[in-house]
């Protein structure tokens, strides 16, 4: 622990020095900077050279990773040890994308036979629905799927569908997550129950929001097809066969997954069955292959050449060395527009903790606030704040080197924007440059005195650039696995368990208590504000 404390001290000292430097000038001072801070892995080009660290800062960050035993933690995770200590579980979402003959064990017990058995069932179901061998109650083939889930049972599959969906899908895929009747009504308004397959995703089949939407879906089906007919339009992702049977789902249409798969890591599992059916098995299998390729890199590459480790260390350098408490993720790809929403759960639910596995308060700041949206749209929204705001927010840009979608020339325009933003954030624009421009335009000295400071850009805003060769199932799988491993590395260094989520429980319990109070109109013991709101909102 003394070595770890010393490593933290060195990182903070190095960050203080680097924070006084201009990133743009580091390229001159460090001739090997670009080569040292760019990697090509599994169809991804990753450029960390515009980050705020200098050579000494990078060295201090790597020393911290060694002191925190990232390598040992990595070995324990891939070895199937119960690194989710609060729940006594292994963490093996990597097994879901491993080859069927891989030697993967949870607590010493081989798991790949079970994983492969579920994959075989998923593939058979996918092909049967797509071919029309599995039909609805009226004999019509399924033309739409309604995916019902929330959290990890929604965010991952929804992003996966956006990334992989055909331009003109033969099977449409819709999602319902929120316990808000408006979402269900709007999503199903133009669907035909006779041609819609409903897939309910809940490991325990007890999730309140999901069951409420599932009940609405069943009523919607039953109104058109009858109770027995509705059963033919149901499938489930769950381990609670008794509950799915009671709901009307045949056992051969229930697909499970394991306790060693956390919800936010579950899109590699049967949780994404709806996407496999809508996109085809080949696309889903390619997604798994891309994740496996990134797993191999993360498992085998030394820390100084390890993409997930370096991206994690850049965030730790910004968060803990430079006190940057937020990070903006901006995909310059319409298909990846939900990436920031997915990463909000992955990173903030994993590492948004103030207590470590030993029950003691952590000694350093943990997860940053993640936000973001689609580029170039955000340039006309919050990028004013990114360029000239009082707080410096590191950014992460995600782009595609090539895209065949859309009219000719549009992709080049998109790329020009992402490259310009990253450069502008780093180099900025001096008051002198602005003054020269205004003088050339004949602006008076009095006006220049007020306008020039407003039009200057301080620059020195750090960013990372992640470029996919193309958006394919394989490169998308590699991208998601990269972020998963990055999140794991950060958790190891911060000293938190990245695989539990006790922070979501209290609100669930209190909502369960408040619901009957809203229905009865009799508020229980609450603070004055909540009691008054219950009185105002009672049903």
UniProtKB/Swiss-Prot annotation:
GO terms for biological process: gluconeogenesis; glucose 6-phosphate metabolic process; glycolytic process. Its EC number is 5.3.1.9. It catalyses: alpha-D-glucose 6-phosphate = beta-D-fructose 6-phosphate. Pathway: Carbohydrate biosynthesis; gluconeogenesis; Carbohydrate degradation; glycolysis; D-glyceraldehyde 3-phosphate and glycerone phosphate from D-glucose: step 2/4. Keywords: Cytoplasm, Gluconeogenesis, Glycolysis, Isomerase. It is found in: Cytoplasm. Its main location: cytoplasm. The active site is at residues 349, 380, 508. Transmembrane segments: none annotated. InterPro entries: G6P_Isomerase, G6P_Isomerase_C, Phosphoglucose_isomerase_CS, SIS_dom_sf, SIS_PGI_1, SIS_PGI_2. The keyword Cell division does not apply. One of its GO terms (cellular component) is cytosol. GO terms for molecular function: carbohydrate derivative binding; glucose-6-phosphate isomerase activity; monosaccharide binding. SUPFAM superfamilies: SIS domain. Catalyzes the reversible isomerization of glucose-6-phosphate to fructose-6-phosphate. Belongs to the GPI family. This is Glucose-6-phosphate isomerase. The gene is pgi.
């Amino acid at each position: 622990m003394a070595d770890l404390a010393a490593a933290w001290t060195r990182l903070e000292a190095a960050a203080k020095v680097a924070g006084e430097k201009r990133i743009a000038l580091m390229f001159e001072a460090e001739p090997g900077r670009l080569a040292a801070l760019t990697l090509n892995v599994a169809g991804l080009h990753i450029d960390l050279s515009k980050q705020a660290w200098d050579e000494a800062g990078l060295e201090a960050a790597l020393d911290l990773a060694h002191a925190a035993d990232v390598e040992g933690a990595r070995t324990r995770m891939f070895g199937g040890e119960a690194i989710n200590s609060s729940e006594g579980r292994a963490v093996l979402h990597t097994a879901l994308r491993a080859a069927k003959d891989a030697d993967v064990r949870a607590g010493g017990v081989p798991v790949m036979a079970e994983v492969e058995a579920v994959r075989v069932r998923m593939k058979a179901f996918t092909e049967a629905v797509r071919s029309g061998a599995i039909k609805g109650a009226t004999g019509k083939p399924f033309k739409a799927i309604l995916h019902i889930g929330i959290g990890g049972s929604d965010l991952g599959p929804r992003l996966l569908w956006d990334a992989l969906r055909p331009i003109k899908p033969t099977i449409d895929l819709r999602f319902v997550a929120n316990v808000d009747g408006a979402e269900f009504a709007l999503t199903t308004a133009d669907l035909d129950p006779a041609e819609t397959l409903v897939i309910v995703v809940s490991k325990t089949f007890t999730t309140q929001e999901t069951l409420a939407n599932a009940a609405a879906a069943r009523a919607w089906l039953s109104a058109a097809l009858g109770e027995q007919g509705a059963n033919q339009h149901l499938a489930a992702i769950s381990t609670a066969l008794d509950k799915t049977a009671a709901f009307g789902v045949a056992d051969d249409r229930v697909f499970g997954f394991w306790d060693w798969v956390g919800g936010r890591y579950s899109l590699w599992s049967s949780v994404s069955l709806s996407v496999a059916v809508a996109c085809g098995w080949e696309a889903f299998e390619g997604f798994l292959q891309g994740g496996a390729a990134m797993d191999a890199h993360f498992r085998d590459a030394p820390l100084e050449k390890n993409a997930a480790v370096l991206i994690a260390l850049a965030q730790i350098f910004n968060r803990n060395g430079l006190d940057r408490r937020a990070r903006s993720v901006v995909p310059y790809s319409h298909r990846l527009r939900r990436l920031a929403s997915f990463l909000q759960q992955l990173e903030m639910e994993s590492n948004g903790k103030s207590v470590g596995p030993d029950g003691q308060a952590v000694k350093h700041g943990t997860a940053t606030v993640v936000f973001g949206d689609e580029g170039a749209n955000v340039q006309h929204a919050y990028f004013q704040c990114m360029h000239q705001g009082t707080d410096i927010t590191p950014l992460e840009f995600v782009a595609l080197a090539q895209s065949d979608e859309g009219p000719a020339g549009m992709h080049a325009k998109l790329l020009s924007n992402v490259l310009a933003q990253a450069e502008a954030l780093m180099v900025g624009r001096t008051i002198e440059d602005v003054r020269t421009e205004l003088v050339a335009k004949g602006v008076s000295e009095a006006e220049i005195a007020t306008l020039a400071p407003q039009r200057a850009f301080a620059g020195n805003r750090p960013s990372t650039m992640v470029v996919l060769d193309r958006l394919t199932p394989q490169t998308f799988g590699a991208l998601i696995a990269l972020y998963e491993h990055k999140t794991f590395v950060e958790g190891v260094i911060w000293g938190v368990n990245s695989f539990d989520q006790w922070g979501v429980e209290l609100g669930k319990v209190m909502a369960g208590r408040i619901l009957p109070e809203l229905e009865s109109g009799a508020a229980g013991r609450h603070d004055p504000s909540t009691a008054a709101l219950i009185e105002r909102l009672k049903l």
